[in-house]
Amino acid sequence: MKEYIRLLMIFILPMGVLLGCGKADVEEPAEQVPTEQIAIEGTEVEDYSALSYSGLEVLAYEGDSQAQIMLGRKLEYGDEETAQNFTEALSWYQMASDSGDYNGTCALGYFYLTGTGVDQNLDKAEELFNTAIDGGVDNAKVGLARVILTRGDYLVNLDAQDDEELSTEDGEKEESKDKTSTEEQSEDLKKAVELLTEAAKAEDLDGQYYLGFIYEHGVGVALDYSKAFDYYSRVTRSESMALQDQDSINQSNIALGLMYIKGHGVEVDEDTALEHFETASENGSAKASYYIGQLYESGVGVDRDYEKAMEYYLLAADKDYAPALNQIGYLYYNGYGVDVDFASAVYYQKLAALQGYAIAQVNLGFLYENGYGVERNLETALSYYEMAADSGYEGATEAVVRVKAQINEKL
Protein backbone atom coordinates (compact mmCIF):
# COMPACT_ATOMS: atom_id res chain seq x y z
CA MET A 1 0.00 0.00 0.00
CA LYS A 2 2.79 2.39 0.88
CA GLU A 3 4.40 1.73 -2.43
CA TYR A 4 1.22 2.83 -4.18
CA ILE A 5 0.91 6.16 -2.46
CA ARG A 6 4.61 6.77 -2.84
CA LEU A 7 4.25 6.52 -6.59
CA LEU A 8 1.69 9.28 -6.42
CA MET A 9 4.31 11.72 -5.14
CA ILE A 10 5.53 13.15 -8.40
CA PHE A 11 9.27 13.37 -7.93
CA ILE A 12 11.47 12.63 -10.93
CA LEU A 13 15.20 12.62 -10.46
CA PRO A 14 16.98 11.60 -13.64
CA MET A 15 20.34 13.23 -13.07
CA GLY A 16 18.69 14.96 -10.13
CA VAL A 17 15.66 16.45 -11.90
CA LEU A 18 13.30 17.87 -9.31
CA LEU A 19 9.56 18.16 -9.52
CA GLY A 20 7.35 20.33 -7.48
CA CYS A 21 4.40 21.31 -8.70
CA GLY A 22 3.16 30.13 -0.68
CA LYS A 23 4.01 35.18 3.45
CA ALA A 24 6.16 35.19 6.51
CA ASP A 25 4.75 35.68 9.99
CA VAL A 26 4.20 39.34 10.83
CA GLU A 27 6.99 40.59 13.07
CA GLU A 28 6.83 43.36 15.63
CA PRO A 29 6.43 46.74 13.90
CA ALA A 30 9.65 48.51 13.07
CA GLU A 31 10.42 51.82 14.73
CA GLN A 32 8.25 54.42 13.08
CA VAL A 33 9.41 57.67 11.60
CA PRO A 34 7.66 60.45 13.52
CA THR A 35 4.95 61.83 11.29
CA GLU A 36 5.90 65.39 12.08
CA GLN A 37 9.14 64.83 10.17
CA ILE A 38 7.41 64.00 6.92
CA ALA A 39 3.98 65.59 7.08
CA ILE A 40 5.11 69.17 6.59
CA GLU A 41 3.18 70.85 3.82
CA GLY A 42 5.29 70.98 0.67
CA THR A 43 8.05 68.72 1.98
CA GLU A 44 9.66 66.72 -0.84
CA VAL A 45 10.27 63.07 0.07
CA GLU A 46 13.28 61.46 -1.60
CA ASP A 47 12.97 57.89 -0.28
CA TYR A 48 9.44 56.64 0.31
CA SER A 49 10.71 53.18 1.27
CA ALA A 50 12.31 54.71 4.39
CA LEU A 51 8.94 55.89 5.70
CA SER A 52 6.84 53.93 8.18
CA TYR A 53 3.32 52.78 7.35
CA SER A 54 1.77 55.61 9.36
CA GLY A 55 4.11 58.12 7.75
CA LEU A 56 3.06 56.93 4.30
CA GLU A 57 -0.60 57.15 5.30
CA VAL A 58 -0.23 60.83 6.18
CA LEU A 59 1.13 61.58 2.72
CA ALA A 60 -1.28 59.22 0.97
CA TYR A 61 -4.34 60.89 2.47
CA GLU A 62 -2.93 64.22 1.34
CA GLY A 63 -3.06 62.87 -2.22
CA ASP A 64 0.57 61.79 -2.70
CA SER A 65 0.26 59.04 -5.34
CA GLN A 66 3.75 57.64 -4.69
CA ALA A 67 2.85 57.14 -1.04
CA GLN A 68 -0.42 55.52 -2.11
CA ILE A 69 1.45 53.08 -4.34
CA MET A 70 4.01 52.32 -1.63
CA LEU A 71 1.18 51.53 0.79
CA GLY A 72 -0.33 49.31 -1.87
CA ARG A 73 2.97 47.45 -2.25
CA LYS A 74 3.29 46.94 1.50
CA LEU A 75 -0.24 45.59 1.73
CA GLU A 76 0.04 43.46 -1.39
CA TYR A 77 3.26 41.71 -0.39
CA GLY A 78 3.32 42.18 3.37
CA ASP A 79 6.45 43.16 5.27
CA GLU A 80 7.82 43.44 8.80
CA GLU A 81 5.21 45.94 9.93
CA THR A 82 2.35 45.23 7.54
CA ALA A 83 0.03 42.25 7.26
CA GLN A 84 -0.93 41.24 3.73
CA ASN A 85 -4.29 42.71 2.72
CA PHE A 86 -5.24 42.59 -0.95
CA THR A 87 -8.47 44.55 -0.54
CA GLU A 88 -6.73 47.54 1.02
CA ALA A 89 -3.87 47.31 -1.47
CA LEU A 90 -6.36 47.46 -4.32
CA SER A 91 -7.97 50.52 -2.78
CA TRP A 92 -4.68 52.44 -2.62
CA TYR A 93 -3.73 51.45 -6.17
CA GLN A 94 -7.13 52.60 -7.38
CA MET A 95 -6.68 55.93 -5.60
CA ALA A 96 -3.28 56.42 -7.24
CA SER A 97 -4.64 55.46 -10.64
CA ASP A 98 -7.58 57.83 -10.28
CA SER A 99 -5.14 60.66 -9.61
CA GLY A 100 -3.38 59.94 -12.91
CA ASP A 101 -0.42 57.87 -11.68
CA TYR A 102 0.14 55.20 -14.35
CA ASN A 103 2.11 53.00 -11.96
CA GLY A 104 -1.08 52.64 -9.94
CA THR A 105 -2.94 51.77 -13.13
CA CYS A 106 -0.35 49.10 -13.91
CA ALA A 107 -0.62 47.64 -10.40
CA LEU A 108 -4.40 47.43 -10.80
CA GLY A 109 -3.87 45.55 -14.04
CA TYR A 110 -1.95 42.80 -12.26
CA PHE A 111 -4.76 42.35 -9.74
CA TYR A 112 -7.25 41.80 -12.55
CA LEU A 113 -4.79 39.59 -14.44
CA THR A 114 -4.27 37.20 -11.54
CA GLY A 115 -7.66 37.55 -9.84
CA THR A 116 -6.03 38.88 -6.68
CA GLY A 117 -8.61 40.57 -4.46
CA VAL A 118 -11.02 40.75 -7.42
CA ASP A 119 -12.51 38.36 -9.95
CA GLN A 120 -10.06 37.66 -12.75
CA ASN A 121 -10.89 39.87 -15.73
CA LEU A 122 -8.42 39.69 -18.60
CA ASP A 123 -10.26 42.32 -20.65
CA LYS A 124 -10.08 44.79 -17.76
CA ALA A 125 -6.41 43.92 -17.20
CA GLU A 126 -5.65 44.49 -20.88
CA GLU A 127 -7.36 47.88 -20.79
CA LEU A 128 -5.41 48.96 -17.71
CA PHE A 129 -2.08 47.75 -19.06
CA ASN A 130 -2.59 49.55 -22.38
CA THR A 131 -3.37 52.75 -20.49
CA ALA A 132 -0.22 52.33 -18.37
CA ILE A 133 1.89 51.59 -21.45
CA ASP A 134 0.65 54.82 -23.02
CA GLY A 135 1.76 56.48 -19.79
CA GLY A 136 5.30 55.13 -20.18
CA VAL A 137 5.26 52.26 -17.65
CA ASP A 138 7.56 49.51 -18.95
CA ASN A 139 6.29 46.90 -16.49
CA ALA A 140 2.83 47.22 -18.04
CA LYS A 141 4.27 45.63 -21.18
CA VAL A 142 5.02 42.53 -19.11
CA GLY A 143 1.47 42.57 -17.82
CA LEU A 144 0.02 42.81 -21.33
CA ALA A 145 2.27 39.97 -22.50
CA ARG A 146 1.02 37.87 -19.59
CA VAL A 147 -2.58 38.62 -20.58
CA ILE A 148 -1.82 37.23 -24.04
CA LEU A 149 -0.06 34.18 -22.64
CA THR A 150 -2.81 33.55 -20.10
CA ARG A 151 -5.50 33.71 -22.78
CA GLY A 152 -3.51 31.19 -24.80
CA ASP A 153 -3.20 28.93 -21.74
CA TYR A 154 0.58 28.95 -21.85
CA LEU A 155 0.82 28.64 -18.07
CA VAL A 156 3.10 31.62 -17.74
CA ASN A 157 2.09 32.77 -14.29
CA LEU A 158 4.58 33.81 -11.66
CA ASP A 159 2.17 32.87 -8.91
CA ALA A 160 1.30 29.39 -10.23
CA GLN A 161 1.88 26.72 -7.62
CA ASP A 162 1.74 23.79 -10.02
CA ASP A 163 5.15 23.09 -11.52
CA GLU A 164 4.01 20.52 -14.07
CA GLU A 165 5.89 22.46 -16.73
CA LEU A 166 9.07 21.11 -15.12
CA SER A 167 8.04 17.47 -15.26
CA THR A 168 9.83 16.39 -18.43
CA GLU A 169 12.89 14.18 -18.52
CA ASP A 170 16.32 15.80 -18.70
CA GLY A 171 16.95 17.35 -22.08
CA GLU A 172 13.43 16.64 -23.32
CA LYS A 173 11.18 19.49 -24.39
CA GLU A 174 7.76 19.08 -22.88
CA GLU A 175 4.83 18.36 -25.14
CA SER A 176 2.34 21.17 -25.40
CA LYS A 177 -0.84 21.98 -27.17
CA ASP A 178 -0.49 23.13 -30.76
CA LYS A 179 0.14 26.69 -29.65
CA THR A 180 1.00 27.99 -33.10
CA SER A 181 -1.65 26.08 -35.06
CA THR A 182 -3.35 29.25 -36.24
CA GLU A 183 -2.10 32.52 -37.63
CA GLU A 184 -3.89 34.37 -34.83
CA GLN A 185 -2.07 32.40 -32.14
CA SER A 186 1.26 32.99 -33.86
CA GLU A 187 0.63 36.73 -34.03
CA ASP A 188 -0.39 36.81 -30.39
CA LEU A 189 2.79 35.02 -29.35
CA LYS A 190 4.88 37.31 -31.51
CA LYS A 191 3.30 40.32 -29.81
CA ALA A 192 3.95 38.85 -26.35
CA VAL A 193 7.61 38.22 -27.18
CA GLU A 194 8.00 41.77 -28.51
CA LEU A 195 6.49 43.24 -25.35
CA LEU A 196 8.71 41.18 -23.06
CA THR A 197 11.79 42.03 -25.11
CA GLU A 198 11.03 45.75 -24.88
CA ALA A 199 10.52 45.51 -21.12
CA ALA A 200 13.71 43.49 -20.67
CA LYS A 201 15.73 46.05 -22.63
CA ALA A 202 14.37 48.70 -20.27
CA GLU A 203 15.88 46.65 -17.38
CA ASP A 204 12.48 45.58 -16.09
CA LEU A 205 13.14 42.51 -13.92
CA ASP A 206 9.75 40.93 -14.61
CA GLY A 207 10.40 41.31 -18.33
CA GLN A 208 13.80 39.66 -18.04
CA TYR A 209 12.43 36.79 -15.95
CA TYR A 210 9.56 36.04 -18.33
CA LEU A 211 11.79 36.34 -21.36
CA GLY A 212 14.03 33.74 -19.73
CA PHE A 213 10.96 31.58 -19.12
CA ILE A 214 9.76 31.60 -22.73
CA TYR A 215 13.26 30.81 -24.03
CA GLU A 216 13.61 27.97 -21.53
CA HIS A 217 10.29 26.46 -22.56
CA GLY A 218 10.20 27.45 -26.23
CA VAL A 219 6.99 29.47 -26.00
CA GLY A 220 6.72 31.63 -29.12
CA VAL A 221 10.48 31.34 -29.70
CA ALA A 222 12.94 28.57 -30.42
CA LEU A 223 13.93 26.82 -27.20
CA ASP A 224 17.27 28.29 -26.13
CA TYR A 225 18.67 27.37 -22.72
CA SER A 226 21.63 29.70 -23.18
CA LYS A 227 19.40 32.76 -23.58
CA ALA A 228 17.17 31.60 -20.75
CA PHE A 229 20.18 31.24 -18.47
CA ASP A 230 21.39 34.71 -19.46
CA TYR A 231 18.09 36.43 -18.71
CA TYR A 232 17.61 34.62 -15.40
CA SER A 233 21.17 35.54 -14.41
CA ARG A 234 20.55 39.22 -15.15
CA VAL A 235 17.65 39.21 -12.72
CA THR A 236 19.56 37.44 -9.95
CA ARG A 237 22.36 40.01 -10.18
CA SER A 238 19.91 42.80 -9.39
CA GLU A 239 20.34 44.52 -6.04
CA SER A 240 16.78 45.86 -6.05
CA MET A 241 15.10 45.82 -2.65
CA ALA A 242 11.71 46.86 -4.07
CA LEU A 243 8.96 44.57 -2.83
CA GLN A 244 7.54 44.12 -6.33
CA ASP A 245 10.90 42.87 -7.65
CA GLN A 246 11.48 40.09 -5.13
CA ASP A 247 9.23 37.54 -6.81
CA SER A 248 11.11 37.79 -10.09
CA ILE A 249 14.46 37.63 -8.30
CA ASN A 250 13.36 34.54 -6.37
CA GLN A 251 11.82 32.86 -9.40
CA SER A 252 14.99 33.46 -11.41
CA ASN A 253 17.16 31.94 -8.68
CA ILE A 254 14.86 28.92 -8.61
CA ALA A 255 14.93 28.62 -12.39
CA LEU A 256 18.73 28.71 -12.40
CA GLY A 257 18.82 26.13 -9.63
CA LEU A 258 16.66 23.79 -11.67
CA MET A 259 18.76 24.33 -14.78
CA TYR A 260 21.83 23.29 -12.79
CA ILE A 261 19.98 20.25 -11.43
CA LYS A 262 18.84 19.16 -14.89
CA GLY A 263 21.89 20.23 -16.85
CA HIS A 264 19.90 22.50 -19.14
CA GLY A 265 22.43 24.68 -20.93
CA VAL A 266 24.99 24.13 -18.16
CA GLU A 267 26.88 21.26 -16.59
CA VAL A 268 24.99 19.55 -13.78
CA ASP A 269 26.10 21.25 -10.57
CA GLU A 270 24.04 20.34 -7.53
CA ASP A 271 26.06 22.54 -5.17
CA THR A 272 25.38 25.64 -7.27
CA ALA A 273 21.74 24.63 -7.57
CA LEU A 274 21.46 24.47 -3.79
CA GLU A 275 23.06 27.92 -3.49
CA HIS A 276 20.41 29.41 -5.78
CA PHE A 277 17.60 27.69 -3.88
CA GLU A 278 19.01 28.88 -0.56
CA THR A 279 19.27 32.46 -1.81
CA ALA A 280 15.61 32.45 -2.80
CA SER A 281 14.53 30.65 0.37
CA GLU A 282 16.31 33.19 2.57
CA ASN A 283 14.52 35.89 0.58
CA GLY A 284 11.16 34.41 1.53
CA SER A 285 10.38 32.02 -1.33
CA ALA A 286 8.23 29.07 -0.25
CA LYS A 287 8.88 27.27 -3.52
CA ALA A 288 12.64 27.48 -2.98
CA SER A 289 12.27 26.09 0.54
CA TYR A 290 10.26 23.23 -0.94
CA TYR A 291 12.98 22.42 -3.47
CA ILE A 292 15.63 22.37 -0.74
CA GLY A 293 13.40 19.94 1.11
CA GLN A 294 13.28 17.80 -2.03
CA LEU A 295 17.08 17.76 -2.21
CA TYR A 296 17.38 16.59 1.39
CA GLU A 297 14.59 14.05 1.02
CA SER A 298 16.17 12.49 -2.06
CA GLY A 299 19.81 12.98 -1.12
CA VAL A 300 20.65 14.94 -4.26
CA GLY A 301 23.78 17.02 -3.74
CA VAL A 302 23.47 16.56 0.02
CA ASP A 303 23.30 13.64 2.44
CA ARG A 304 19.76 12.31 2.66
CA ASP A 305 18.19 13.82 5.76
CA TYR A 306 14.44 13.45 6.26
CA GLU A 307 14.43 15.67 9.34
CA LYS A 308 16.11 18.45 7.38
CA ALA A 309 13.64 17.90 4.55
CA MET A 310 10.76 18.23 7.00
CA GLU A 311 12.29 21.45 8.34
CA TYR A 312 12.24 23.05 4.90
CA TYR A 313 8.82 21.68 3.99
CA LEU A 314 7.42 23.20 7.18
CA LEU A 315 9.07 26.51 6.29
CA ALA A 316 7.22 26.46 2.97
CA ALA A 317 4.03 25.18 4.59
CA ASP A 318 4.00 28.24 6.86
CA LYS A 319 3.17 30.12 3.66
CA ASP A 320 0.50 27.58 2.65
CA TYR A 321 2.56 26.22 -0.23
CA ALA A 322 0.51 23.24 -1.42
CA PRO A 323 3.33 20.98 -2.70
CA ALA A 324 5.10 21.27 0.66
CA LEU A 325 1.91 20.51 2.58
CA ASN A 326 1.44 17.45 0.41
CA GLN A 327 4.99 16.29 0.98
CA ILE A 328 4.71 16.67 4.76
CA GLY A 329 1.73 14.34 4.57
CA TYR A 330 3.85 11.93 2.54
CA LEU A 331 6.59 11.89 5.19
CA TYR A 332 4.04 11.23 7.94
CA TYR A 333 2.43 8.44 5.91
CA ASN A 334 5.73 6.66 5.38
CA GLY A 335 7.35 7.54 8.71
CA TYR A 336 10.33 9.27 7.11
CA GLY A 337 12.07 11.34 9.77
CA VAL A 338 8.96 11.12 11.94
CA ASP A 339 6.80 8.40 13.46
CA VAL A 340 4.17 6.99 11.12
CA ASP A 341 1.07 9.11 11.66
CA PHE A 342 -1.81 8.52 9.25
CA ALA A 343 -3.97 11.18 10.91
CA SER A 344 -1.30 13.83 10.30
CA ALA A 345 -0.89 12.55 6.76
CA VAL A 346 -4.60 13.11 6.16
CA TYR A 347 -4.47 16.56 7.79
CA TYR A 348 -1.68 17.90 5.58
CA GLN A 349 -3.02 16.27 2.43
CA LYS A 350 -6.35 18.02 3.05
CA LEU A 351 -4.66 21.39 3.41
CA ALA A 352 -3.01 20.88 0.03
CA ALA A 353 -6.11 19.42 -1.61
CA LEU A 354 -8.20 22.43 -0.55
CA GLN A 355 -5.94 24.54 -2.76
CA GLY A 356 -6.80 22.36 -5.75
CA TYR A 357 -3.51 20.46 -5.66
CA ALA A 358 -4.31 17.34 -7.68
CA ILE A 359 -1.56 15.11 -6.26
CA ALA A 360 -2.92 15.63 -2.74
CA GLN A 361 -6.46 14.96 -3.97
CA VAL A 362 -5.35 11.61 -5.37
CA ASN A 363 -3.49 10.80 -2.16
CA LEU A 364 -6.56 11.64 -0.09
CA GLY A 365 -8.64 9.45 -2.34
CA PHE A 366 -6.25 6.60 -1.63
CA LEU A 367 -6.36 7.19 2.13
CA TYR A 368 -10.16 7.20 2.20
CA GLU A 369 -10.37 4.24 -0.16
CA ASN A 370 -8.21 2.17 2.19
CA GLY A 371 -9.13 3.66 5.56
CA TYR A 372 -5.72 5.02 6.52
CA GLY A 373 -6.04 7.73 9.18
CA VAL A 374 -9.77 8.02 8.50
CA GLU A 375 -12.78 5.74 8.44
CA ARG A 376 -12.95 3.97 5.08
CA ASN A 377 -15.35 5.87 2.84
CA LEU A 378 -15.56 5.00 -0.85
CA GLU A 379 -17.87 7.91 -1.67
CA THR A 380 -15.40 10.42 -0.23
CA ALA A 381 -12.54 8.65 -1.98
CA LEU A 382 -14.44 8.88 -5.26
CA SER A 383 -15.04 12.60 -4.72
CA TYR A 384 -11.32 13.32 -4.32
CA TYR A 385 -10.38 11.14 -7.29
CA GLU A 386 -12.95 12.95 -9.42
CA MET A 387 -11.53 16.34 -8.41
CA ALA A 388 -8.10 15.25 -9.59
CA ALA A 389 -9.51 13.71 -12.76
CA ASP A 390 -11.34 16.96 -13.58
CA SER A 391 -8.01 18.77 -13.50
CA GLY A 392 -6.52 16.22 -15.90
CA TYR A 393 -4.28 14.43 -13.43
CA GLU A 394 -2.89 11.26 -14.96
CA GLY A 395 -4.12 8.10 -13.27
CA ALA A 396 -7.06 9.71 -11.49
CA THR A 397 -9.56 8.54 -14.10
CA GLU A 398 -8.54 4.92 -13.56
CA ALA A 399 -9.01 5.40 -9.82
CA VAL A 400 -12.50 6.79 -10.43
CA VAL A 401 -13.43 3.71 -12.45
CA ARG A 402 -11.99 1.38 -9.79
CA VAL A 403 -13.82 2.98 -6.88
CA LYS A 404 -17.11 3.20 -8.78
CA ALA A 405 -16.85 -0.54 -9.37
CA GLN A 406 -16.32 -1.11 -5.64
CA ILE A 407 -19.34 1.03 -4.80
CA ASN A 408 -21.51 -0.84 -7.30
CA GLU A 409 -20.45 -4.17 -5.80
CA LYS A 410 -21.84 -3.03 -2.44
CA LEU A 411 -25.25 -2.19 -3.88
Where are the model-predicted features located?
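Short helix-capping/linker turns of helical repeat alpha-solenoids
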Residues: 61-64, 78-79, 99-101, 114-116, ...
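Hydrophobic face of amphipathic alpha-helices that form TPR/SEL1-like repeat modules
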Residues: 70-77, 107-114, 146-155, 212-217, ...
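Terminal, low-structured helical/coil segments at or just beyond the last alpha-helical repeat
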Residues: 387-411
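TPR/TPR-like (Sel1-like) alpha-helical repeat modules
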Residues: 232-236, 376-393
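C-terminal motif of bacterial Sec signal peptides marking the signal peptidase cleavage site
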Residues: 19-20
